[in-house]
Amino acid sequence: MMIDTIADMLTRIRNANQRLHKSVKMPSSKMKVRIAEILKKEGYVEDFKVSGDIKKDLTLTLKYKGKTKVISGLKRISKPGLRVYVTVEEVPQVLNGMGIAIISTNQGIMTDKAAKKAHLGGEVIAYVW
């Protein structure tokens, strides 16, 4: 049985966000931590922390403005059955720059803006708006 851990992460965030939960907990991985760093840097989550010794857990503290959700939507783009790769010219712009695309490049995981600035293409992991 194969599970898409990034899709699972996005689904957990989406579900907790819809229910206005303060935080969401999930199994940790290096890729998930890097995505959490990007979400924090871009202002979509308040904070995150990794805890545990053997089985590490990633806890994201979600961000709200009153009762308004900061994250309007999350969408997994590249899936295990259908990978989506783009060149630097094809790097997508989410909602005319109002959202972000998370891209895995040979220099690491970064936003669409950082990938364009570094003149890199790669695998489009997800859209966040």
Curated annotation (Swiss-Prot):
The gene is rpsH. Part of the 30S ribosomal subunit. Contacts proteins S5 and S12. One of the primary rRNA binding proteins, it binds directly to 16S rRNA central domain where it helps coordinate assembly of the platform of the 30S subunit. Signal peptide: none annotated. Keywords: Ribonucleoprotein, Ribosomal protein, RNA-binding, rRNA-binding. This is Small ribosomal subunit protein uS8. It comes from the Bacteria. GO terms for biological process: translation. One of its GO terms (molecular function) is rRNA binding. Belongs to the universal ribosomal protein uS8 family. It comes from Spiroplasma kunkelii. It holds the Pfam family Ribosomal_S8. SUPFAM superfamilies: Ribosomal protein S8. One of its GO terms (cellular component) is ribonucleoprotein complex.
